[in-house]
């Protein structure tokens, strides 16, 4: 829809109370899925995954035993195996280091990990995944490049235990396509366009866990994240899925390691600067020749931060030339596309169709104010709603986040602020306190707008409308989608409120409604004399259907 098109009609908050009461009654009459998540029922007619016979290995405690029709055999001792893809048929000689057992993939089944999965929040379970193969003669619609269950992947039983323990029964849509490509042999690069909430973290996690040898105490896979918060969360996902394996993880972020200590874990997860520092120190810290997989998550966010893109390529240059490179990004403008093609050349590619990205699972409202001061007064009045579960309040500037937090605390409210200017240890403690429920309300900037998933969050407040920055025209709708995607996770109900206070912010909200094709309920802060009724409207919004 164009910007010139009239926005969807909004309703007053008073009307909203009556309407939501009706919706609540209607909801009680229906037991349907209503778009909140995929059912756990597995589909029939499994498609065979890419097959390359795994090479058996003696004395490898099961990690190298043959598994029929395995899509990956750890791929590193049998790099010349044929699997329909083009690529090097030799190991380029960098296996002068000890060669790990040849096969690590037996079975596995489950879906996403709880911390970064669920097809129920931002992304509905009806989106389509488009596959583009690096081998132009290959058929992307072939059953070889799709699975319907994790059992078809013949993953290691210890990985299967971890997935099942996490409570998942079937792959998400993107996992159905990504996992056969990631696990095939010889290993091929992969570029994926995927938002948080689609299962991509579990996908590249399973690939890393399948590629490393737990009997060799040195890093064999590296995952790069643009922030320490996301790196810590990815480590939690890897540890959860790999809990029954002997694979260890190491968090490579500032302050997490002694500069002269050798790393004896198989998977490194961290931020670019720290990873460069480790690799530059050479064999005293780790052996770069042993790295088999390099993963980059949230590439678009990383590119947006000055210097991180260059550091990422420095990491790539310090690794063997035939490392499997995997890149995921939520958006793919020209800069991201160019970066991705350089980072992962000759890659298989997976994309979500843009029109399939929806926000239907989240109840959206906007609160119309007259001034910045009235915005704060409205936020303070809403505090009782913010602590029904947990809430995140997004601001444009760090100073605004601190100012709001200080004022709310001075009024006796329990909140915390989080942004990039805080010390690393302080940021960790603040986010941990929010994760475990010690803090109910977090005032923050975009530092946790992407990828960070906390199940108890059921309200997001956009105190400031996200914009495109200097020289930009209009709202940053991608950031808005990522922000509100912090709520409504894992089948829970979610509510989003965005504040307006002047012509520009009101116009931006209209453009957001037009683009998303979804009306927002209007709350007029100027006429709010009965706070209880306003709270009732928001509470109903969080309980009722989106």
Swiss-Prot record:
<keyword id="KW-0906">Nuclear pore complex</keyword>
<keyword id="KW-0509">mRNA transport</keyword>
<dbReference type="GO" id="GO:0044614">
    <property type="term" value="C:nuclear pore cytoplasmic filaments"/>
</dbReference>
<dbReference type="GO" id="GO:0005934">
    <property type="term" value="C:cellular bud tip"/>
</dbReference>
<dbReference type="GO" id="GO:0006415">
    <property type="term" value="P:translational termination"/>
</dbReference>
<keyword id="KW-0694">RNA-binding</keyword>
<keyword id="KW-0472">Membrane</keyword>
<dbReference type="InterPro" id="IPR011545">
    <property type="entry name" value="DEAD/DEAH_box_helicase_dom"/>
</dbReference>
<comment type="function">
    <text>ATP-dependent RNA helicase associated with the nuclear pore complex and essential for mRNA export from the nucleus. May participate in a terminal step of mRNA export through the removal of proteins that accompany mRNA through the nucleopore complex. May also be involved in early transcription.</text>
</comment>
<feature type="binding site">
    <location>
        <begin position="194"/>
        <end position="201"/>
    </location>
    <ligand>
        <name>ATP</name>
    </ligand>
</feature>
<dbReference type="GO" id="GO:0006409">
    <property type="term" value="P:tRNA export from nucleus"/>
</dbReference>
<feature type="domain" description="Helicase ATP-binding">
    <location>
        <begin position="181"/>
        <end position="350"/>
    </location>
</feature>
<keyword id="KW-0547">Nucleotide-binding</keyword>
<keyword id="KW-0811">Translocation</keyword>
<protein>
    <recommendedName>
        <fullName>ATP-dependent RNA helicase DBP5</fullName>
        <ecNumber>3.6.4.13</ecNumber>
    </recommendedName>
</protein>
<dbReference type="InterPro" id="IPR014001">
    <property type="entry name" value="Helicase_ATP-bd"/>
</dbReference>
<dbReference type="GO" id="GO:0031965">
    <property type="term" value="C:nuclear membrane"/>
</dbReference>
<keyword id="KW-0347">Helicase</keyword>
<feature type="region of interest" description="Disordered">
    <location>
        <begin position="1"/>
        <end position="113"/>
    </location>
</feature>
<dbReference type="GO" id="GO:0003723">
    <property type="term" value="F:RNA binding"/>
</dbReference>
<dbReference type="InterPro" id="IPR000629">
    <property type="entry name" value="RNA-helicase_DEAD-box_CS"/>
</dbReference>
<dbReference type="Pfam" id="PF00270">
    <property type="entry name" value="DEAD"/>
</dbReference>
<dbReference type="GO" id="GO:0000822">
    <property type="term" value="F:inositol hexakisphosphate binding"/>
</dbReference>
<keyword id="KW-0963">Cytoplasm</keyword>
<dbReference type="InterPro" id="IPR001650">
    <property type="entry name" value="Helicase_C-like"/>
</dbReference>
<dbReference type="GO" id="GO:0015031">
    <property type="term" value="P:protein transport"/>
</dbReference>
<dbReference type="GO" id="GO:0010494">
    <property type="term" value="C:cytoplasmic stress granule"/>
</dbReference>
<dbReference type="InterPro" id="IPR027417">
    <property type="entry name" value="P-loop_NTPase"/>
</dbReference>
<feature type="compositionally biased region" description="Low complexity">
    <location>
        <begin position="72"/>
        <end position="81"/>
    </location>
</feature>
<dbReference type="InterPro" id="IPR014014">
    <property type="entry name" value="RNA_helicase_DEAD_Q_motif"/>
</dbReference>
<keyword id="KW-0653">Protein transport</keyword>
<keyword id="KW-0539">Nucleus</keyword>
<keyword id="KW-0813">Transport</keyword>
<keyword id="KW-0067">ATP-binding</keyword>
<feature type="short sequence motif" description="Q motif">
    <location>
        <begin position="148"/>
        <end position="176"/>
    </location>
</feature>
<comment type="similarity">
    <text>Belongs to the DEAD box helicase family. DDX19/DBP5 subfamily.</text>
</comment>
<dbReference type="GO" id="GO:0016887">
    <property type="term" value="F:ATP hydrolysis activity"/>
</dbReference>
<comment type="subunit">
    <text>Associates with the nuclear pore complex.</text>
</comment>
<feature type="domain" description="Helicase C-terminal">
    <location>
        <begin position="361"/>
        <end position="531"/>
    </location>
</feature>
<dbReference type="GO" id="GO:0016973">
    <property type="term" value="P:poly(A)+ mRNA export from nucleus"/>
</dbReference>
<dbReference type="GO" id="GO:0005524">
    <property type="term" value="F:ATP binding"/>
</dbReference>
<keyword id="KW-0378">Hydrolase</keyword>
